[in-house]
Amino acid sequence: MAGNDWLNSYLEAILDVGPGLDDAKSSLLLRERGRFSPTRYFVEEVIGFDETDLYRSWVRASSSRSPQERNTRLENMCWRIWNLARQKKQLESEAVQRVNKRRLERERGRREATADMSEDLSEGERGDPVSDVSTHGGGDSVKSRLPRISSADAMETWVNSQKGKKLYIVLISIHGLIRGENMELGRDSDTGGQVKYVVELARALGSMPGVYRVDLLTRQVSSPDVDWSYGEPTEMLAPRNTDEFGDDMGESSGAYIIRIPFGPRNKYIPKEELWPYIPEFVDGAMGHIIQMSKALGEQIGSGHAVWPVAIHGHYADAGDSAALLSGALNVPMIFTGHSLGRDKLEQLLKQGRLSTDEINSTYKIMRRIEAEELALDGTEIVITSTRQEIEEQWRLYNGFDPVLERKIRARIRRNVSCYGRYMPRMSVIPPGMEFHHIAPLDGDIETEPEGILDHPAPQDPPIWSEIMRFFSNPRKPVILALARPDPKKNITTLVKAFGECRPLRELANLTLIMGNRDGIDEMSSTSSSVLLSVLKLIDKYDLYGQVAYPKHHKQSDVPDIYRLAAKTKGVFINPAFIEPFGLTLIEAAAYGLPMVATKNGGPVDIHRVLDNGLLIDPHDEKSIADALLKLVSNKQLWAKCRQNGLKNIHLFSWPEHCKTYLSKIATCKPRHPQWQRSEDGGESSESEESPGDSLRDIQDLSLNLKFSLDGERSGDSGNDNSLDPDGNATDRTTKLENAVLSWSKGISKDTRRGGATEKSGQNSNASKFPPLRSRNRLFVIAVDCDTTSGLLEMIKLIFEAAGEERAEGSVGFILSTSLTISEIQSFLISGGLSPNDFDAYICNSGSDLYYPSLNSEDRLFVGDLYFHSHIEYRWGGEGLRKTLIRWASSITDKKSENNEQIVSPAEQLSTDYCYAFNVRKAGMAPPLKELRKLMRIQALRCHPIYCQNGTRLNVIPVLASRSQALRYLYVRWGFELSKMVVFVGECGDTDYEGLVGGLHKSVILKGVGSRAISQLHNNRNYPLSDVMPLDSPNIVQATEGSSSADIQALLEKVGYHKG
């Protein structure tokens, strides 16, 4: 291409580069349109790039003096614009394809689930799935979405009804800097509105009647870069109003921030880097909850542990943690997403600036999404701030389908079987707000003496003068925006709208409170980029003296900032592209500020209730400017919006929020560990050796106990909590009682024989059942070897490394594997090992737990009486099994002559809580993420695991795993995780990541299980490095071919000392 001078004039024509026309010379069309520019619309909306960025590129391209070089630069720029526009179209096409694919998958899964659930209904009962659902779910009114506070009498009645209850509630929010006073909101992207929300929620719940204690668990940060207060283990949250509900205070009652140490000890890191340390947090949090439950039991539980009535996770990382804690402790879980990963991914892809890989690398977005999916699997209730979050964001997830959710809910109301399908309930509960510190304005600008804001009085808040110093005319109304400098907050569009509208500039000032900063160079790249863009726009539109952007403010200054804007008859604006809720809008309304807010997200619901402002399209500068101008120029409208806000603000209060919150918790089916523990950590049952308390407890839990060695299922289980259709409950109970009586007699006959505990000089604890309770340390062998001979070699190596401690009995061993108990028996016999060489056997990938029998003549192993009741939450039973078999039959080798089936059921290997499948061609089996997606779309909750180098698939309960089984041993028997050493290979089964990380020590044996890296882990949603804390001091790696002496040296390195 030659002679590109025309490009310069073309770009000059479509860019606003020259001096603006004054109103007298501008065309009537432009004046009527409010300076609407068709060319700018083309640049920013059609091409999809900011005019300022394009102008900057054009200036650089045309700055060369050489005509030939300038032509070349302009040509390259045009090709770049063309390529970017083409890329944008490609991204839009890919987005449409993703939506269509998701819709087809959802519809297919919905059809299959509905067909399965319709098997037991007559033709007249089935009806149309959607119409059947609508009669039970939809049509929520505004009142049902945003419950209004009751009258004083109704509230008093409710308070009286809660007296006598003493609930323990656990909240989790692990990222950011959290403290009760002087919160550093806006310091970074992790310390924002969520921090304030969880602190105020904990404080408000702690003041409610019927709530004895609230713990807000977060990360302990002892970094020199942050204040010392973030390193304090415990901080009490004093109630705002001690007169509220303080009549039943006790020794440990109230609300507390509990800081759990995990991750790098002396470093404050962003939330994207916390993922590998989640297991360590879970272990630490579990220790605190168990300790606190025991302490509360002594105070208010008559000696019985008081377990949390719910564990509430906030954001994806805490949702992942809450799900693991809920499974380990067997208590209900609640989840609040705050900001959702799938929605963020869609927004970033639409921008077209980053590829999926780049997004995942920067934000760890796939790990975040999987955590949110796991939270949906484990939670009873999802609490949202708005209906929009449910309808437009949560429906993007495989684990939630609004139509299927209403269908399942309708069947539950009719007491009809759901065939193992579960869906969390979505509840809209707007965040509350504290009103104690809000005082009405003590004056109005119209009644103040002249110049009151030009020369602030000494008693005026210091932040006022800090803002006013920016303005040449401080008496004008203040347009206030309070948000951190984040692209999604859309501050630059607000500044453009202000700069483009001359009437607005003449009538008002703009105040931007964009967090705290010392220097622009010290800010994160994203934040500094936004701030620089704002400063350049201020310079471009010559807004000096009209825009304030103070560098610092304290949290205590925020009320004064609102008061200043209200005193000047200003407006509060939230122009974010999408606002999950918009708590600042409620705060502003409480101070008498009308609002202008985005029409995307929570502000729609807030505006519907408060009716105190206008909604705008955040992408439309003219819409923003017009709304602001309308409010600041029309005093009657301003006064009406102000009055509406003040009149209706009481609809958003913490007491009402907590009342609704507690009523939702009350609907959760109570779950907690079923056994009772004595003070010394033992069982409080009649027999010290018995792991169970009584047959009555077993019968109440409807446990399907299994004491056989063949590993076969003893009957169908866990259909969906419905009654036995064959009416065989009596026969089943009789079989259970006979089995337990026989087992108990076997225990009483003899003490443990063989192994290290044969010695008569053993301490008195040796007779305890199971033997692991008497150990000082536990070695957990969870090595997923390629062959059984390799596993035997590793076991003997670890036995040898234990040395004298094994002979003395101070160290016990646990075998953790995907094998069934019958396969383990065969393996032990062939390897010349005794069942008593191990204190426990975690079988079937963590779905079964056995101990060596004290009477080995009668039977070699006995199952834990309570383990299945602990892990059976949302187990799909027969409904899940049928769906899995149908899925397996569809996986065939299309290249073979007879469409050979790749995945087939392994009935002889399956148990009540583990459905096993043989995989003939591991390389051709679908990746696990596809199976998880399929099950979630059909509302089936499970944990599929490829094991034994991909030749077997085990499907177990959703919150069960080998790592969770170790946590169960801690909860059940009190054996501390920090005293466990877990041996794993270089890689292993697809649950491998859960075994590395946590409070236990981990020894990675290089060269063992390495084949699984390519066989099983290539098709992961996220790399292992995103979830494995290889820099943890609790993890050491043994070189290939290490000897027992090498392993002993590694154990000393991680702090393991003999004795």
Curated annotation (Swiss-Prot):
Activity is regulated by phosphorylation and moderated by concentration of metabolites and light. Residues 102-114 have a biased composition (Basic and acidic residues). Its EC number is 2.4.1.14. GO terms for biological process: sucrose biosynthetic process. Pfam families: Glycos_transf_1, GT-B_Sucrose_synth, S6PP. Residues 681-691 have a biased composition (Acidic residues). Keywords: Glycosyltransferase, Transferase. Gene3D superfamilies: 3.90.1070.10, Glycogen Phosphorylase B, HAD superfamily/HAD-like. GO terms for molecular function: sucrose-phosphate synthase activity. It catalyses: beta-D-fructose 6-phosphate + UDP-alpha-D-glucose = sucrose 6(F)-phosphate + UDP + H(+). It is an enzyme of class 2 (transferase). Pathway: Glycan biosynthesis; sucrose biosynthesis; sucrose from D-fructose 6-phosphate and UDP-alpha-D-glucose: step 1/2. CDD domains: GT4_sucrose_synthase, HAD_SPS. Residues 95-145, 671-695, 710-731, 748-769 are annotated as: Disordered. Belongs to the glycosyltransferase 1 family. Homodimer or homotetramer. Plays a role in photosynthetic sucrose synthesis by catalyzing the rate-limiting step of sucrose biosynthesis from UDP-glucose and fructose- 6-phosphate. Involved in the regulation of carbon partitioning in the leaves of plants. May regulate the synthesis of sucrose and therefore play a major role as a limiting factor in the export of photoassimilates out of the leaf. Plays a role for sucrose availability that is essential for plant growth and fiber elongation. This is Probable sucrose-phosphate synthase. It comes from Vicia faba.
